Amino acid sequence: VRTHERVLARIEADLATGRWALGERLPAERALAEELGVSRPSVREAIRVLEAMGIVRTAVGSGPDAGATVVDRPAAGLGAAVRLHVASGTLAVRDVVETRVLLETWAAGAAAERVVAAQGTGERGADPGPGAPEVAEALAAARALLDRMDDPALAAEEFRELDASFHVLLVRLAGNPLVEAVMTGLRGAIESYVAQGSAALPSWERTAARLRAEHRAVLAAVTAGDGDRAAREVRAHIEGFYAETGL
């Protein structure tokens, strides 16, 4: 085992036992090196790995924000790893598509369930259910994204960015942080194959019009609390585009 891997294992163990909590700073490089009996370059390499994984954020200097701070960015490491594997050819586009279908059909159903739960009880929902403000905010944000995508002057690249944001938002609405992190991590790979496929379409305008309608159908099902229909709509949406592009 390389020295920096021993440092990583020790930091992982300390995080697991709660020695360092979210938002706290790790000891200074010199202090960590002395505590673990390793060189400062080994500590430095371990911190770089942790930063790439989205576990810590580093800042230079001597102020209160200097050093390595424990953060919550799980999608950072996942996204970088997935993008590199897709680029190297070790992950096929079909693998990404199938993973999307698994994640997003589940998320669509779970999001619809949250919508129903948030409606609460009593006359006209007088007693809101759990997470009602967050659910209402997410639905409003999703509608706003789709409204922006209706702009006929929108460039294809901007459309795709809004499209990706809409899908990540729906997964966030499902309320599972880990699934959201995986989906966010997949975003770069998804945008890559969508851009590649879009370039081969005979008519982007026609496809964009269909995608707009499909997005509206997915959101309508989620808003209505119909999880089964939402899952069917999102599956047809994802697989339909993949089939159309012939990737």
Predicted feature locations:
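Short linear motifs at protein or domain termini
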Residues: 1-102, 106-109, 113
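Short, flexible helix-adjacent loops and helix caps
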Residues: 16, 20, 61, 112-116, ...
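Short loop-to-helix capping motifs
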Residues: 28-29, 175-177, 225-227
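All-alpha effector-binding/dimerization core of bacterial HTH-type transcriptional repressors
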Residues: 75-173, 206, 210-223
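Amphipathic alpha-helical segments in well-ordered regions
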Residues: 106, 110, 169, 173, ...
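C-terminal all-alpha effector/ligand-binding and dimerization domain
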Residues: 124, 128, 187-247
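Inward-facing hydrophobic residues that define packing positions of alpha-helical scaffold repeats
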Residues: 142, 146, 183, 234-235
